[in-house]
């Protein structure tokens, strides 16, 4: 996975810099998201792996499948990615692009998993506290996992805060073993 990210990074960075310069971050994010989804389709996977097709043929097929959903700049981007045999990296390119976009917009996607459903007031309060701590706008996604027993697990990028009962029991068990 790290190798794929390394290969995808220059393409994501170039796309991000272009989109940012032209104030098109949202549209590029949507188009790259579509490209990532199309590249993961089973039929498209076979096309991308076909040894008899040239990179130009693969790019043309890819763009044709997406129809008018791509503007000219994204079509050119797809051609460049195809010329370097990197179309299978589109999901990683799109993910990195979205990370760069979130960083530029000073926002972060936060996943909160709790043992019980959080009501809207609790979610708003948690988002406010996290926003202050992370110094970013927080987009909160809440889910439930009864196996946590109690508490919450918060994931924001590389940051993981495990305040669950299950996590505390695991730490206690580890401490008792050593």
Swiss-Prot record:
SUPFAM superfamilies: N-terminal domain of the delta subunit of the F1F0-ATP synthase (SSF47928). Its main location: membrane. It is found in: Cell inner membrane. Keywords: ATP synthesis, Cell inner membrane, Cell membrane, CF(1), Hydrogen ion transport, Ion transport, Membrane, Transport. GO terms for cellular component: plasma membrane; proton-transporting ATP synthase complex. GO terms for molecular function: proton-transporting ATP synthase activity, rotational mechanism. It is a peripheral membrane protein. It comes from the Bacteria. Belongs to the ATPase delta chain family. F-type ATPases have 2 components, F(1) - the catalytic core - and F(0) - the membrane proton channel. F(1) has five subunits: alpha(3), beta(3), gamma(1), delta(1), epsilon(1). F(0) has three main subunits: a(1), b(2) and c(10-14). The alpha and beta chains form an alternating ring which encloses part of the gamma chain. F(1) is attached to F(0) by a central stalk formed by the gamma and epsilon chains, while a peripheral stalk is formed by the delta and b chains. F(1)F(0) ATP synthase produces ATP from ADP in the presence of a proton or sodium gradient. F-type ATPases consist of two structural domains, F(1) containing the extramembraneous catalytic core and F(0) containing the membrane proton channel, linked together by a central stalk and a peripheral stalk. During catalysis, ATP synthesis in the catalytic domain of F(1) is coupled via a rotary mechanism of the central stalk subunits to proton translocation. This is ATP synthase subunit delta. The gene is atpH.
